[in-house]
Curated annotation (Swiss-Prot):
The lineage of its organism: Bacteria, Pseudomonadati, Chlamydiota, Chlamydiia, Chlamydiales. A motif (GyrA-box) lies at residues 527-533. SUPFAM superfamilies: GyrA/ParC C-terminal domain-like (SSF101904), Type II DNA topoisomerase (SSF56719). Few gyrases are as efficient as E.coli at forming negative supercoils. Not all organisms have 2 type II topoisomerases; in organisms with a single type II topoisomerase this enzyme also has to decatenate newly replicated chromosomes. The keyword Cytoplasm applies. It catalyses: ATP-dependent breakage, passage and rejoining of double-stranded DNA. It is an enzyme of class 5 (isomerase). One of its GO terms (biological process) is DNA-templated DNA replication. PANTHER family: DNA GYRASE SUBUNIT A, CHLOROPLASTIC_MITOCHONDRIAL, DNA GYRASE/TOPOISOMERASE SUBUNIT A. Heterotetramer, composed of two GyrA and two GyrB chains. In the heterotetramer, GyrA contains the active site tyrosine that forms a transient covalent intermediate with DNA, while GyrB binds cofactors and catalyzes ATP hydrolysis. GO terms for molecular function: ATP binding; DNA binding; DNA negative supercoiling activity. This is DNA gyrase subunit A. The gene is gyrA. Residues 34-500 form the Topo IIA-type catalytic domain.
């Protein structure tokens, strides 16, 4: 029979299910699956760490059984069963899952191969220094405490969190209708980013990217491209493409290669990956691999793929990226609880939320310290007052009937507060000595200073920020670690296509209007010496002319430098293939991000970006810079800054330095030349400005040519009026870098100014082109070597009023007379390569 007080309320089933499911959803979102933006922890993680703190499991304490930790957590704070709590504890101890583990485990806590941890009765754990930083000052009323599930104890709503743990360790979880997947970051970089936002709340995400370029996963690996990082940081959502770290080694027989995997993408099971590769080999999806084995040990990961003889490691690596978890996608979703509401946040908003939390913690801690200091100062004031009339105080106490009567007498006769009276009654006799009185006075004075400081902190926001800044800087100094994950520019879109591109020799032509094309070498048929040749570029089309010719392979890189100091990458196979008479297409069509007024100034053909080789860049005003070639080894679609250009200056040349014997020669418009060893120019970073290469005679003078030469070569200097001179390199006295140099050719009315200079041999030909379209090709065997001080000889008879505007070197095959490649070009007083 129903109780009279019970009331039955009829309710629509559909409405009840909606309300119940909504309550369940919010419970999962807030109390289970999503981390708090302030300390980066879910409730289960927070309760485990708090239970460990209550057990006093500090980094210096002995490890305790995980069964004890899980039991206390379950019994006191998290009533979900020990078997549910233990996996959370285990994950916080795994250094391949957490960038900065919060639990120091002892025993078998699993492996990157997916092996399970030992049972909790066998394993032991304690807190790490990272978790201590999260818990620090918890006992100073810095955060709210709430009753536990059965209201027998109190637990913190959030930890004080001395560092932004959510971004340091990341988080993942699936709630109802939403999920979070936050990547981990490097603590040192994150602190630098946080300091930027702390100093200037309007800090842009671009500025954050400069100090924190992207996530840093505990397993290392490689992030391909920055587009996913930028999307994640700006919008809170993005896709990061992660790759294993791979290198290639020669097999012991030196006839085959081995592909070695030394770091896994985040959350990839190594053992499962090895099985996956083996299965694909058996299915013939992956060909060219003879054996796969896991040689990992205590020193690190090492998965070896032995290739069959003659197989290309690059092609197989690309197939691994395509078909296996050697390359995976990390779907970042920066979703966290902010003020108890789930929000998808940008990197700036997430850092700002932690700063707000930390400022609140500092204020609450300061208020706690202030109250403590004021309470103690109040007691010390009573001591000092009592010590000043100690005889009367002692007499009053002796005449009192009991402690309560003595306390009442002290309050009534001397004006002490109850707290002061109790403290006086508890004084020991030795504290009445002169030395102890001095100590009391000193302590009181120190407390007054602290109280004044605490009040300033509570009144001034900037002082709170200063405290946070000092704490972060101390953490940065002590706990900064190198990045594990490297970020490489995305060349993956090119790789898959390149595998099917034939590796063949081609001829590349660039016109004066920067039209480019490529042609197979076979279209230039071999001829005997003295043949008429074939047309490789139609010189009759408008006013355009052939500016440069290169011999290259379809899989080579072209480094394209502009007059504004930018460098762009192109693969040779990306250039349009054209017929011999075709003009080609504008090269700027293939360069993303090129700015108005930016023109091609130099082009280099590079097969490999080798260490120990350099690029030499030269500007019109005589600035030179040497950069390691491997600094350009990470292609970027929108180019990079190769040289910082001064106002009014421009890049005119880029040269490839391959050995120590090569010298640098700079030629100026007014006939001066300087020669010096390239080691006089120290290697610099890509964004550096460079150093002085030559001092110009006056404001009308400028550099027209930069050459990299050896002492056994000769150089041809050509003037506007068709005159020139070929001299030995050794005839040009070596001078210091930055000097005015020596005369290269006499500048007078007959010769005109210097058009350019090119290093040549007897087997080279020079193509000279004039403003009126006249062109002549001169064999260098017909131009004798002359002394440096001579005026030179006539190279070409120009029509009246005509002048030379361009010169080009063509290397000639002495057996066939066939033009093979062009090394250098001067056009309108700018150097092309």
């Amino acid at each position: 029979m129903l109780n009279k007080e019970e009331i039955i309320v009829p309710k629509n089933l559909e409405e009840e299910m909606k309300e119940s499911y909504l309550r369940y959803s919010m419970s999962v979102i807030i109390s289970r699956a999503l981390p708090d933006v302030r300390d980066g922890l879910k409730p289960s993680q927070r309760r485990i760490l708090y239970a460990m703190k209550q057990l006093n499991l500090t980094p210096g304490a002995k490890h305790r059984k995980c069964a004890k930790i899980c039991g206390d957590t379950s019994g006191d704070y998290h009533p979900h069963g020990e078997a549910v709590i233990y996996p959370t504890l285990v994950r916080m101890a795994q250094d391949w899952a957490m960038r900065y583990p919060l639990v120091d485990g002892q025993g078998n806590f699993g492996s990157i191969d997916g092996d399970p941890a030992a049972a909790m009765r066998y394993t032991e754990a304690r807190l790490t220094h990272s978790s201590i930083f999260l818990l620090e000052d918890l006992d100073k009323d810095t955060v709210d405490m709430v009753p536990n599930y059965d209201e027998t104890k109190y637990e913190p709503v959030v930890f004080p969190s001395k560092f932004p743990n959510l971004l340091c360790n990341g988080s993942s979880g699936i709630a109802v209708g939403m999920a979070t997947n936050i990547p981990p970051h490097n603590l040192g970089e994150l602190i630098e980013a946080t300091l930027l936002v702390l100093a200037n709340p309007q800090t842009s995400i671009e500025e954050i990217l400069e100090v924190m370029p992207g996530p840093d996963f505990p397993t290392g690996g490689i992030i391909c491209g920055t587009e996913g990082i930028r999307s994640t940081y700006y919008t809170g959502r993005g896709k990061l493409r992660l790759r294993a770290r791979i290198h290639v080694e020669e097999n012991s027989d030196k006839q085959r290669e081995n592909i070695i995997l030394t770091e896994m993408p985040y959350n990839v099971n190594k053992s499962r990956l090895v099985e996956q590769i083996a299965e694909l080999i058996n299915e013939k999806t992956l060909t060219g691999i003879s054996d796969v084995r896991d040689e990992s040990d205590k020193d690190g990961i090492r998965v070896v793929l032995e290739l069959k003889k003659g197989e290309s490691s690059e092609v197989i690596i690309n197939r691994l990226y395509k078909f296996t978890d050697v390359q995976v996608t990390f779907g970042a979703n920066m979703l966290a609880l902010d003020k108890n509401l789930p929000r998808t946040m940008s990197i700036h908003r997430m850092i700002s939320a932690w700063i707000r939390h930390r400022m609140d913690v500092i204020r609450r801690r300061t208020r706690y310290e202030l109250n403590k200091a004021e309470t103690r100062a109040h007691i010390l004031e009573g001591f000092l007052k009592a010590l000043s009339c100690m005889d009367e105080v002692v007499k009053t106490i002796r005449e009192s009937s009991n402690k309560e009567h003595a306390k009442q007498q002290l309050v009534e006769l001397f004006g002490f507060s109850e707290a002061q009276s109790l403290a006086i009654l508890e004084l020991r006799l030795y504290q009445l000595t002169g030395l102890e009185i001095d100590k009391v006075q000193k302590e009181y004075n120190e407390l007054l200073e602290k109280i004044a400081y605490y009040r300033r902190v509570l009144a001034e926001e900037e002082l709170v920020k200063d405290i946070i800044r000092e704490e972060l800087q101390e953490l940065h100094k002590v706990h900064k670690t190198p990045r594990r994950t490297t970020i490489e520019m995305d060349a993956g879109d090119v790789r898959d296509i390149e595998d099917i591109i034939a590796d063949e020799s081609v001829i590349i032509t660039i016109s004066g209007d920067d039209y480019v094309k490529r042609m197979p070498v076979k279209v230039f048929r071999e001829q005997k010496r003295g043949g008429q040749g074939v047309t490789g570029f139609d010189m009759k089309k408008g006013s355009d002319f052939l500016k440069a010719v290169y011999s290259a392979s379809t899989k080579d890189y072209l480094l394209i430098f502009t007059n504004m100091g930018q460098c762009y990458w192109l693969k040779v196979w990306q250039l349009p293939e054209g017929e011999r008479r075709a003009k080609g297409k504008p090269i700027i069509n293939f360069l993303e991000g090129i700015r108005p007024g930016e023109q091609v100034a130099a082009v280099l053909n590079v097969k490999r970006f080798e260490q120990g080789e350099y690029l030499l860049l030269a500007t019109k005003k005589g600035v030179v810079k040497k950069v390691s070639l491997d600094a350009f080894g990470s292609p970027r679609k929108k180019g990079i800054r190769a040289l910082e250009i001064d106002d009014g200056d421009e890049l005119i040349a880029a040269r490839h330095i391959v050995n120590d014997e090569e010298k640098v020669m700079l030629f100026t418009r007014l006939g001066m030349a300087v020669r010096f060893p390239h080691d006089k120019v120290r290697p610099m970073g890509r964004a550096a400005r460079g150093v002085r290469g030559v001092s110009l005679k006056n404001e009308e003078d400028f550099v027209v040519s930069c050459q990299v030469v050896t002492d056994d070569q000769s150089v041809l200097v050509v003037c506007d009026n068709g005159f020139g001179k070929r001299s030995l390199v050794c005839d040009f006295r070596e001078t210091n870098r930055g000097s005015v140099g020596v005369r290269s050719i006499l500048i007078n009315q007959r010769n005109g100014d210097v058009l350019g200079a090119i290093s040549v041999t007897d087997f080279d030909s020079i193509l000279l082109m004039s403003a009126q379209g006249q062109a002549i090709r001169i064999n260098m065997q017909d131009v004798r070597v002359m002394g440096r001080a001579t005026q030179g000889v006539r190279l070409v008879n120009l029509r009246e009023g005509d002048t030379l505007v361009a010169m080009e070197k063509l290397s000639v095959n002495t057996e066939s007379g066939e033009t093979e490649e062009s090394v250098s070009i001067q056009v309108g007083h700018a150097v092309e390569e």
